[in-house]
């Protein structure tokens, strides 16, 4: 029997697969209603801000040959409504499922306010601090690119809440290792990486960008080598748990990310091809591990053999 159980701060995962933040909304999108979320290791909810936000102009999503470009923005009803309606319903339906809430904001005070309210609700097991979303003009982008700011923000949130916090890193930086170290210095319990890579595509007939917001975040197959490289670099400087993401669409991808240094993974863009991608990946994982003669998935963490 292959062991796929992974124990991370605040998150006791029956398997290392979860949806990336935003993928399944607050557990209320059609795909999330089509299967039992208990089949996954955890549920990660959409980024929550202090007040309701409407997101970016349409079109918000462009499906590319090898990935997805999105500028959805942090559309959510605000933290109070997320707790009273969305999370209460999700927790009622899934009493034992580990739930991670994603925290966003325009200022340090925003982040602290949202984190405190989510922590105090008793409805979630861990917080993911979204310092990296490249979609919103006044949003998290600026926080995630400066090591000093990341450290300070992490410290403030850590002092304000009892829950474990995972800082979600943006790849749109000069040195990802420096930012990861800053998160660790600030007291992060773990790291999520990578968020989307800032990009743009243009329609040659109209000469207009494909997205209403012009630029957006690239995810999917195209960013996988970037994600694997960055996770590997960060794993070499920290023992913090890493939740890896960026182009995962198969159980084999999961193994590759774990070899690079991830402890668990999040699946996002693969759901555009297969709305039950995370479920299918989790189901296929034991057989893939068995093929490789692996008895415990935890034994693979960071075990890449460099040339």
From Swiss-Prot:
Substrate binds at residues 46, 70-74, 130, 195-196. It comes from Lactobacillus delbrueckii subsp. bulgaricus (strain ATCC BAA-365 / Lb-18). It comes from the Bacteria. InterPro entries: Aldolase_TIM, DHO_dehydrogenase, DHOD_1B, Dihydroorotate_DH_1, Dihydroorotate_DH_1_2, Dihydroorotate_DH_cat, Dihydroorotate_DH_CS, Dihydroorotate_DH_I. Gene3D superfamilies: Aldolase class I. Its cofactor is FMN. One of its GO terms (molecular function) is dihydroorotate dehydrogenase (fumarate) activity. It catalyses: (S)-dihydroorotate + fumarate = orotate + succinate. Its EC number is 1.3.98.1. Binds 1 FMN per subunit. This is Dihydroorotate dehydrogenase A (fumarate). FMN binds at residues 21, 46-47, 130, 168, 194, 220, 246-247, 268-269. Catalyzes the conversion of dihydroorotate to orotate with fumarate as the electron acceptor. Disulfide bonds: none annotated. SUPFAM superfamilies: FMN-linked oxidoreductases. Its main location: cytoplasm. It is found in: Cytoplasm.
């Amino acid at each position: 029997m292959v062991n796929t159980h992974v124990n991370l701060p605040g998150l006791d995962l029956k398997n290392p697969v979860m949806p990336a933040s935003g993928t399944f909304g607050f557990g209320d999108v059609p795909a999330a209603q089509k299967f039992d979320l208990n089949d996954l290791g955890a549920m990660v909810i959409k980024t929550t801000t202090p007040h309701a936000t409407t997101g970016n102009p349409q079109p918000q999503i462009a499906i590319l040959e090898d990935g997805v470009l999105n500028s959805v923005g942090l559309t959510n009803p605000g933290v109070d409504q997320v707790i009273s309606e969305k999370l209460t319903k999700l927790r009622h339906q899934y009493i034992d499922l580990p739930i991670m809430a994603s925290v966003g904001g325009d200022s340090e005070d925003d982040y602290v306010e949202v984190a405190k309210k989510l922590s105090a609700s008793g409805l979630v097991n861990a917080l993911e601090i979204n310092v990296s979303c490249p979609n919103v003009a006044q949003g998290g982008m600026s926080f995630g690119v400066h090591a000093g700011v990341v450290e300070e923000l992490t410290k403030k949130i850590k002092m304000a809440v009892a829950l474990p916090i995972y800082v979600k890193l943006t790849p749109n930086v000069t040195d990802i290792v420096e930012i990861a170290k800053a998160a660790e210095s600030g007291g992060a319990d773990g790291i999520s990486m990578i968020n989307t890579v800032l990009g743009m595509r243009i329609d040659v007939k109209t000469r207009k960008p494909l997205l209403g917001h012009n630029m957006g975040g690239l995810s999917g197959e195209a960013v996988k080598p970037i994600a694997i490289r960055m996770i590997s670099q960060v794993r070499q400087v920290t023992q913090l748990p890493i939740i890896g993401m960026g182009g995962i669409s198969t159980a084999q991808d999961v193994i590759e990310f774990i070899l690079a240094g991830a402890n668990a993974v999040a699946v996002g863009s693969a759901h555009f091809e297969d709305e039950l991608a995370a479920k299918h990946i989790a189901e296929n994982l034991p057989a893939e591990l068995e093929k490789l003669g692996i008895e415990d998935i935890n034994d693979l963490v960071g075990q890449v053999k460099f040339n």
